[in-house]
C-alpha cells in the first residue's frame, strides 16, 4: 500500500513475521524510505535493451560480431552522438575500434603518426558514446559494470557536465595522464568492452548454439562470460546435453553429425575428447570399404588430404551404424514413443541388399554391414560396446563440456516468458484443427499437451543429467533427451520423423520427406497465437512469440513476421549452409524502450576483414512496433518485482510508525 493515512494501523497478520525479517535489512524509517525512493526512481527509467539471437550453429565468428555490434546498436549510438560531426569513415573506424579494440589498436600503432593526438580524440569520443549507452541505467548499475582498474576515472569522465568549464582542466588532465603513463591502450580496451556491455541489458539465445559450425565451444565460452543471458534449448543443444549426461545414442548421433560436416575438431580440440578408439575401430571393420555414401561434406576454407577424408568416411559409417542400433534399443525400450517406423535394420534383406519400408522394397546404395547380425540387428558387438564405453567415459570426463552443459541447465529452459514475449526454439505439437496435441511420453499412460508438456519435458531433461542416484529415472530422462532430438512429437524437432537412414542408403527422395507438425502450417494464424498466449498465461493483445529453428526463405517470398506480427521467426541464419537457400544471413531482434526492431543481416565475411577493412555486417533494420509512450522499467517483469518490493517496504514503514516493529538505531 502507499502510506497515506496516519490514522490507520494495518492488520498485518501473517505479514508481520516477514516484515520483522525485512527490518534486519532496513532497520530504520530512514533506510526503508531511502530504498523506496531509489526503487521508485528505477521504475521510471527507460527499460533496458534486449537482444534476441537464434540458431548460431557453432558459427562463432558471425555470432561474436553480431554480439559485439549489438545488431547495429553500437553504430546507432555513435550516429546519435556524432551523426553531424563525424564522416561515415570516422564512424566506421570508431565502431570497429569498439567491436575489436585489441586488434584494431595493433593496426593503429602501425599507421598512426601522431598517436598521442589520436588517443586524446578517441578517448573523448569513447567517453561520449559510453555516456549515451549508460544514460538509461542508475549510477549504481553502471558502477557495477565498470572495470576495476579504471572505475573511478571512467565514472568521473562519464559524469562530466556540459557547463563544467571550471573543471575542464581537471578532465583534460585525467586523459593526458592516462596517455603519459602508457595506459591509453588498456583504457580504450576497457571502455570499448564497457560500451558493448551497456548497449545490451539482456541477451536471449533462442536455441541451437551447437551443430555443424566450427566453434560452439567458443560461443559457449563467450556466453559464460556474458553479463546477462538466458537460453531456450534447441534440438542440437539437447543432443549435446544428453551426451554430457551419458546417453550413448546422443553421443553416437553427435559424432555422426560432426563427421558429416568434417567437424570432428570440435569434439577433439574443442572439448578434448579422444576419438582415436573410433578411428581404430573404423579402420579394423571398414578397411576395405570406401564408404562412398559417408564421405564428409568439406568446408571450402579447410584443406584435407585424401587419407583424412577416407578415414573420416569410415568413422562416419561406423558411428552411424552404432547410432541406428542404439536408437533401436530406445525405441524397443519405450514403445510409448511410437517410433516403430524408425526400426529399419530389421527390415533389411541382407542377402539381396534391399530394405522394406511401408511395404515397398528399395535397393540399398550400400549393403556392407560387417557389424550387424541379421538375426539380431540391434545388438551391439563386443567391440562396439567397448568403443561406446570409452567414448562415453570421455564425454563424462570432459571438464569443459560438463562446465558448458551445466551452464545450459542453469541459464536455460524449454521456454521463457519475459516482458510479454514467449520464446521457444521449435514449435508446440498440434492437431490439424489447431488444438494442442496430447502426447504420452512414459509408461504411465498420462498425456500432456501445451504448456504442461513443455514443463514435463524440462523436468525429465534435468533428471537425465542430475538424477545420478536413481538409474531408472536417469535412463528415462536420457531417452527423453534423445526423443527431443528426433521424436515425432518433439517441440524442438517439429517433424513426424527424421529420415537419417533413408538419406544415407536410399536414392528415392520420396523416402527422405519429413512432414512438419501442423504448428508450422498454422503459425501465420493469429488465432493460434492467441490460444498459445492464453495457454502460457500471457496477454494476447500485447504479447509476441519469438521462434527459432526454421530458416526464413526470403528468396521464396517468406517473411519472418507471421500472424499480424504476433509471431516472429528469427532463425539467425548464421549457418553458411542455409544462406544460399535463405538469401540472407538471417534475423535478429532488438527490443528497446521505443519498441521492437527486426534486423536482417547480410552474410558476414570474416573477422579479419571486419578489423582490417572495417567491413561491418550490412544490416537492415525494420521497426515492427513503436511504443506510443516509451516503455519504462515499471512496464517490465523486473518492474513488477520492484513494485512488490516497494509495497513491502511501505508496509514496513507502517509497522515502524504504528509501533508494531521497533527501529534498530
UniProtKB/Swiss-Prot annotation:
The keyword Ribonucleoprotein does not apply. InterPro entries: FBPtase_class3 (IPR009164), Metallo-depent_PP-like (IPR029052). It is an enzyme of class 3 (hydrolase). It catalyses: beta-D-fructose 1,6-bisphosphate + H2O = beta-D-fructose 6-phosphate + phosphate. SUPFAM superfamilies: Metallo-dependent phosphatases (SSF56300). Pathway: Carbohydrate biosynthesis; gluconeogenesis. Pfam families: FBPase_2. It comes from the Bacteria. Its cofactor is Mn(2+). One of its GO terms (biological process) is gluconeogenesis. Transmembrane segments: none annotated. One of its GO terms (molecular function) is fructose 1,6-bisphosphate 1-phosphatase activity. Its EC number is 3.1.3.11. Keywords: Carbohydrate metabolism, Hydrolase, Manganese. HAMAP family: FBPase_class3 (MF_01854). Belongs to the FBPase class 3 family. This is Fructose-1,6-bisphosphatase class 3. It comes from Alkaliphilus metalliredigens (strain QYMF). The gene is fbp.
Amino acid at each position: 500500500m502507499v502510506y497515506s493515512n496516519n490514522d490507520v494501523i494495518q492488520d498485518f497478520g501473517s505479514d508481520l513475521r516477514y516484515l520483522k525479517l525485512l527490518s534486519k535489512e532496513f532497520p530504520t524509517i530512514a533506510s526503508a524510505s531511502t530504498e523506496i525512493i531509489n526503487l521508485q526512481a528505477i521504475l521510471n527509467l527507460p527499460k533496458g535493451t534486449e537482444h534476441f539471437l537464434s540458431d548460431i550453429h557453432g558459427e562463432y565468428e558471425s555470432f561474436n560480431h553480431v554480439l559485439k555490434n549489438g545488431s547495429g546498436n553500437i553504430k546507432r549510438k555513435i550516429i546519435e552522438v556524432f551523426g553531424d560531426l563525424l564522416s561515415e569513415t570516422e564512424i566506421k573506424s570508431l565502431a570497429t575500434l569498439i567491436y575489436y579494440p585489441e586488434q584494431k589498436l595493433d593496426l593503429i600503432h602501425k599507421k598512426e603518426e601522431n598517436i598521442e593526438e589520436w588517443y586524446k580524440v578517441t578517448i573523448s569520443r569513447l567517453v561520449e558514446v559510453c555516456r549515451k549507452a549508460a544514460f538509461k541505467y542508475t549510477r549504481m548499475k553502471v558502477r557495477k559494470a565498470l572495470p576495476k582498474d579504471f572505475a573511478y576515472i571512467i565514472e568521473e569522465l562519464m559524469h562530466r557536465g556540459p557547463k563544467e568549464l571550471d573543471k575542464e582542466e581537471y578532465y583534460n588532465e585525467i586523459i593526458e595522464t592516462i596517455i603519459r603513463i602508457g595506459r591509453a591502450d588498456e583504457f580504450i580496451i576497457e571502455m570499448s568492452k564497457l560500451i558493448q556491455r551497456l548497449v545490451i541489458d539482456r541477451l536471449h539465445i533462442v536455441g541451437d548454439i551447437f551443430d555443424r559450425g566450427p566453434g560452439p565451444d567458443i560461443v559457449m565460452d563467450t556466453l559464460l562470460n556474458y553479463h546477462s543471458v538466458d537460453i531456450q534449448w534447441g534440438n542440437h543443444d539437447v543432443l549435446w546435453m544428453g551426451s554430457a549426461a551419458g546417453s550413448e545414442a546422443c553421443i553416437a548421433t553427435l559424432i555422426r553429425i560432426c563427421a558429416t560436416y568434417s567437424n570432428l575438431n570440435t569434439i577433439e580440440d574443442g572439448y578434448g575428447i579422444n576419438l582415436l578408439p573410433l578411428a581404430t575401430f573404423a579402420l579394423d571393420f571398414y578397411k576395405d570399404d570406401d564408404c562412398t555414401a559417408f564421405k564428409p561434406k568439406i568446408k571450402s576454407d579447410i584443406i584435407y588430404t585424401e587419407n583424412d577424408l577416407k578415414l573420416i568416411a569410415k568413422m562416419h559409417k561406423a558411428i552411424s551404424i552404432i547410432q541406428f542400433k542404439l536408437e533401436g534399443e530406445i525405441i524397443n525400450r519405450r514403445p510409448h514413443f511410437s517410433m516403430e517406423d524408425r526400426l529399419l535394420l530389421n527390415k533389411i534383406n541382407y542377402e539381396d541388399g534391399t530394405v522394406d519400408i511401408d511395404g515397398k522394397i528399395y535397393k540399398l546404395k550400400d549393403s556392407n554391414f560387417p557389424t550387424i547380425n541379421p538375426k539380431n540387428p540391434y545388438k551391439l558387438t563386443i567391440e562396439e560396446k567397448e568403443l561406446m564405453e570409452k567414448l562415453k567415459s570421455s564425454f563424462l570426463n570432459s571438464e569443459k563440456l560438463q562446465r558448458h552443459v551445466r551452464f545450459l541447465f542453469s541459464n536455460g529452459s524449454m521456454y521463457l516468458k519475459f516482458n510479454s514475449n514467449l520464446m521457444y526454439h521449435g514449435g508446440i505439437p498440434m492437431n490439424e484443427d489447431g488444438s494442442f496435441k496430447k502426447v504420452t511420453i512414459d509408461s504411465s499412460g498420462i498425456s500432456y499437451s501445451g504448456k504442461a508438456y513443455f514443463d514435463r519435458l524440462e523436468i525429465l531433461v534435468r533428471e537425465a543429467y542430475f538424477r545420478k542416484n536413481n538409474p531408472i529415472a536417469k535412463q528415462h530422462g536420457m531417452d527423453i533427451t534423445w526423443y527431443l532430438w528426433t521424436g515425432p512429437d518433439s517441440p524442438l524437432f517439429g517433424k513426424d520423423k527424421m529420415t537419417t537412414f533413408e538419406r544415407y542408403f536410399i536414392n528415392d527422395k520420396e523416402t527422405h520427406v519429413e512432414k512438419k507438425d501442423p504448428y508450422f502450417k498454422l503459425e501465420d494464424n493469429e488465432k493460434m497465437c492467441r490460444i498459445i498466449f492464453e495457454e502460457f498465461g500471457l496477454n494476447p493483445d500485447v504479447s509476441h512469440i519469438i521462434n527459432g529453428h526454421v530458416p526464413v526463405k526470403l528468396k521464396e517470398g517468406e517473411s519472418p513476421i507471421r500472424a499480424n506480427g504476433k509471431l516472429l521467426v528469427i532463425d539467425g541464419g548464421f549457418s553458411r549452409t542455409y544462406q544460399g537457400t535463405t538469401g540472407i544471413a538471417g534475423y535478429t531482434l532488438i527490443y528497446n524502450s521505443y519498441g521492437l526492431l527486426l534486423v536482417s543481416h547480410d552474410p558476414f565475411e570474416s573477422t579479419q576483414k571486419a578489423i582490417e577493412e572495417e567491413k561491418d555486417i550490412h544490416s537492415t533494420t525494420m521497426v515492427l512496433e513503436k511504443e506510443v509512450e516509451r516503455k519504462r522499467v515499471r512496464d517490465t517483469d523486473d518492474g513488477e518485482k520492484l513494485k512488490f518490493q516497494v509495497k513491502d517496504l511501505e508496509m514496513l514503514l507502517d509497522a515502524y510508525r504504528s509501533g508494531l516493529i521497533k527501529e534498530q538505531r
